Amino acid sequence: MFTHYTGNRQFDLQLNRSLGPILNRPGMDRLTTSVLPRIRSTSQITQFAHRLAAHFNSEGDAAAAWRLYFLAAFYLPEHDPSKRHFIDAASRNFDTSHSHLAMRRHTIPYKDGSLTAIRWQADPDDRARFPDAPSTLVMMNGFDGYAEEIMGFAEYFPCRPFDIITFDGPGQGHTALAGMPLEPRWELPTTAVLDYFDLDSAAALGLSFGGYLVMRAAAHVPRISHVVAFDMMYRLLDGLTLPLPATVRPLAASIVERARPAWLIDATMSVAAHASADLAWKLQQGRHLTGMDKPSDVLRALGAYTMEPLAGMIRQPCLVMAGDANQYVPFERLSDVRRILAGAASLDVRAFTEATDPGMAQHCQIGDPHRAFRIMGDWLVRPAAKPCSTRTRE
């Protein structure tokens, strides 16, 4: 279930994502009903998450602490020393809470730096039950996540007949903190990951902005055997124009796409950011990912991330998840995604509406991640006789 804690859609998305797995902890019901409804700013979210992370850390609950440290870091700019402190604490607690699993970190050489990756070995029993499943699933990060958080999503799979690899590519997570900016040719870091792990074939799943990146990679990397967009992302810049009234979106989109005149874009975006916490965060994150400062330069850089040039280039079987309450991706983009994927070996679309399925209609189906990963897991193990979801995990 997607809970509207604060009434701010962006805040509520992050709170649902981070708090969902730990709502069963003692005292969480009181906090969600008495504290969260009073949150009105990003600084309040940072303070709330930091206090709660420190509490769980002191209690030895690393599984809860790592998620909250990432939430505490989420809205902070990269130059804030607290951000790195929170990220380091999140990584330490993640490692502690997963030390009993067949999971380890890797540092993948890439250009003049390196990519952070985590590999979780397949469950042997699941692999034996589903011999037709891909042997490896590479999960691609998005606009604001870290490799640990993507692996946290992987825990929702009801079974794991495949190794799971998550990584921070250029402009993502730990790699962005190290100063490596985002790059459009996503096939390059993808190839580096496949080469490092000596993989001839792997399925690929992209989360959020990763829903676009996985398509870009699949168009250029034939070693990708299956493609999952969790969920669809046709064009990154849609996330800036979608919150606007529908009547002005086309005009705004044309201005944003051109990012001209630069002086007007810079002035307008700077003023608008003061009135919108959502826009302020998107610009802050865009600067962090691209390494650019002026809003007009950031928009020009982000404009390269669109599926349009990929038409007819993606040949793999594809699964696309979509929801009409997605605050970053217009639901009507589904027709564009279908058109771009017309040459795919197969195309399965799972579309959800807020009227009938409100949790699944949200961005990345965040209101019901167990169900979302059951759907994606079943799709990945086909044509197995029994769906992955028939096995119950404790």
Residue ranges with predicted function:
Residues 338-360:
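Catalytic histidine neighborhood in serine/cysteine hydrolases
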Residues 157-174:
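Conserved alpha/beta-hydrolase
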Residues 314, 320-322, 326:
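Short beta-strand/loop motif that positions the catalytic acidic residue
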Residues 220-299, 321-322:
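Hydrolase active-site cap/lid region
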Residues 355-358, 362-394:
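Catalytic active-site module of serine/aspartate enzymes centered on a nucleophile-bearing elbow/loop
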